[in-house]
């Protein structure tokens, strides 16, 4: 586990640099053994738009080239580059700001689960409009977790 952390700690700034040159952001990076194979999973985000397959290909190629040269991982591995997805987690206040108007599911620390459109945000509050039209406002600190819902 310590070795995995060292690899991620060395790789993270390189990945962030690659992404920033492309106008992208790092959403998550993990390295773990899955079914006897080592999987390096890099999740990227485009703060202005959705991540395209082409962007994933470019990032994968650049990270792969770096890993080949740096020889950070001494065994065979699988590199996966993807986006957070349509039902992406909402982890920071900036995520709620970005997705005003979108359908979300939000779990509050008091056990309530809310599903509705993100109506409005302030510096530290989120307002969500439920299907019945009721608007509920709560502080970001009250949120346990949240994610976008796919709206059909």
Swiss-Prot record:
It holds the Pfam family DUF150_C. It comes from Pseudothermotoga lettingae (strain ATCC BAA-301 / DSM 14385 / NBRC 107922 / TMO) (Thermotoga lettingae). Belongs to the RimP family. Keywords: Cytoplasm, Ribosome biogenesis. The keyword Cytoplasm applies. One of its GO terms (biological process) is ribosomal small subunit assembly. Its main location: cytoplasm. The keyword Cytoplasm applies. CDD domains: YlxS_C. It is found in: Cytoplasm. This is Ribosome maturation factor RimP. GO terms for cellular component: cytosol. Required for maturation of 30S ribosomal subunits. HAMAP family: RimP (MF_01077). It comes from the Bacteria. InterPro entries: Ribosome_maturation_RimP (IPR003728), RimP_C (IPR028998), RimP_C_sf (IPR036847), RimP_N (IPR028989), RimP_N_sf (IPR035956).
């Amino acid at each position: 586990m310590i070795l995995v952390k060292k690899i991620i700690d060395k790789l993270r700034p390189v990945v962030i640099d690659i992404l920033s040159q492309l106008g992208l952001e790092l959403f998550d990076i993990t390295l773990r053994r899955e079914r006897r194979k080592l999987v390096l999973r890099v999740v990227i985000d485009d703060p202005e738009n959705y991540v395209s397959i082409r962007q994933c290909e470019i990032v994968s190629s650049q990270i792969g080239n770096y890993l080949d040269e740096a020889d950070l991982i001494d065994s065979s591995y699988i590199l996966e580059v993807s986006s957070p997805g349509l039902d992406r987690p909402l982890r920071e206040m900036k995520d709620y700001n970005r997705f005003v108007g979108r359908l979300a599911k939000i779990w509050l620390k008091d056990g309530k689960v809310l599903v509705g459109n993100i109506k409005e945000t302030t510096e530290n509050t989120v307002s969500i409009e439920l299907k019945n039209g009721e608007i509920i406002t709560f502080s970001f600190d009250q949120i346990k977790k949240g994610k976008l819902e796919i709206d059909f």
